[in-house]
Amino acid sequence: MKKLNLLFLVFFIIQGCTSVTQKVKKDNRPNILFIMSDDHAYQAISSYDDRLIQTPNIDRLAEEGIKFTNACVTNSICAPSRATILTGKFSHLNGKIDNHSPFDTSQVTFPQLFKKAGYQTAMFGKLHFGNNPKGVDDFLILPGQGDYINPKFLGKEKDTIITGYVTDIITDLTIDWFKNKRDESKPFLMMYLHKAPHRAWWPRADKFAEFYEKKFPEPKTLFDDYSNRGSAAKSAEMNLLTHMRYMEDSKVWPSTIKEMGSVEPEIVYVNERKNLVQSHPNQFFSRYGRANDSQKAEYDITLNKISDDFKTNWPTMNDEEKMRWKFQRYMQDYLATISSVDDNVGRVLNYLDENNLSENTIVVYTSDQGFYLGEHGWFDKRFIYDESFKTPLLIRWPNKIEPGITSDEMVQNLDFAQTFLEAAMINIPDDMQGESLMPLLTGNNEKWDREEVYYHYYEYPSVHMVKRHYGIVSKNYKLVRFYYDVDEWELYDRKKDPYELNNVYENDEYKSIREDLHLRLESLRIKYKDSDELNDFYINKYLEKNKSRN
C-alpha cells in the first residue's frame, strides 16, 4: 500500500511539473505589428523624400529594416486595397472592386488564418468595410471613414464615442491592449490602422496652428495642362483649383463664403450617384461640429486666420495665385495629420522597445495607396500614375532583415498576406495570388523573379470621375488601357519620363516595346484570371445598381 501511495505521489509531482512547464512555455513564432495609414503618400515620408516633412519615427523602420521604392497597389482606392491586403487576391476575385460594392464575407482573410494557427489577434482603427472583422479576438474600428474629432468606434461588445483626436485614440487603444489584454504565451498579430491622412485632413488643434504657419515647396507638375495625354487625365475631377472645396477642404468658414457672395471658381463635382452637386456648409460642420466647446475654441484661432486671409486676398488673386493658395492650405493640413501619425508610431515603437518586444516583432508600415500632393495639379488617388499607384512600404525584423537596405523590386500589397503567413510558418492557401516577400527580406534576391505588376481600377462613373482602366507596369515602362466610355491606350517611358507627361503609345520608336507589353499584359490577365468578360460583368452590375437607385 505504501508503494502504491508513493507511486501516486510521484505521478502527481510529475504532472504538476509538466503543468507548470506548459504554463511558462512560450510560442517563439514572430509577432506581427501591421501599421497602415490611409492615403499616406510616399512623398510625405522623409526616408523617401524629405522636402515636405520630417518623419523620424517612421524613418526608424527604414533605418532598422528594409525600404521598398517600387511598392505599389493593385487598385488605388481605400476599401478595395484593404480587401486585397486581407485576402491576397485582386479585386475582381475578392469582389471588392470599389468603395460601394459589398465585400464577399466568404473570402478567407489572413487574420483568420493567424487566429486558427494560435495567434492572438487584434485590430484598432480604420477597416472601412463591415462592422465585424473576421479573425480578430478584439477590435474597435471606425464606422466607414470615421471621424477625426471625438470619433465613434464599433466594438465586439459595444459601440463607443471616445473624446479626443482619432490618431491619438487609436494609439491609446493599441498600447492599452498590449498592456492589459495580451496573452504572453501566444504570439500576436496587431492591426494598427490609422484614419489619417484621409480627406478632409483635420489635424489636431495644436498641429493645425503649427502647420498653418509653414510654407511648402510646390511639385514641378503643379500646373500640368495634360496636353500630351488622353481624355482620362483631362476629365478627372481632382484639380486643386476647380475641385477642392473651400469649406470642407480648405476650411474657410461657411459664413465667410456666404458673406463674400460669389467665390470663383465655383466648385461643382459629380458624387457617387453621378449627380452634379455643389459644396455645402454641412460638409464643414459635420467635421467641426463634433468638437466640444473647448476643442472648438482651439480650432477657431486658426480657422479665423484662414478665413480672414481668404476674404482679404482671394478676390484679387489670378488663377495661378489661387492654385498656389489652395496647394499651401492642402499641404498644411495634410502634413499636420501625418505629423500626428509619426508621433504616434513613435509611441508604439517605444513601447515595443521598453517591453522587450522589438526583437521578435515584425513591424510593417504602409498605406492603403499613394496620393497626389499637387502633382499634375491633383489631390486624391485612383490613377495608375505613380503618385497614387506607388505606396510606402517599410519592414523591420531584427536579426532577419539587414538594417538600412533598399529594394527597388516590383512588389504589391497583393503580397502582404503570403509574406506574413510564411513568416509565421502558417500554410498559405492555394488561391492567394501574390508572392511572399521573404526572399527579399532575408537577402535571397536571386529567388525573386517578378518583372512587372498588374493594375485594375473600376470606380467610374463616380466621385472624382477617373475612368476605368487596367495596365502593366515594369521598372522601365507603363502600358494602360482606359475603357467603358472610351477606348484609349497610354504608354510611358518611366526612365526618360519619370513625371509621366508624354504618352508615347503612337510613337513609332516604341513599336516593338508596345507590342511586347501588349503580350505581357495579356499574359498577366490570364495569370490573375482577369478578362473582358469580367469587365462586362462588373459594368452590368454597376448599371443595374444605378438603375435600381433611380
Language model segments and positions:
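Formylglycine-dependent sulfatase
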Residues: 2, 7, 17-483, 487-489, ...
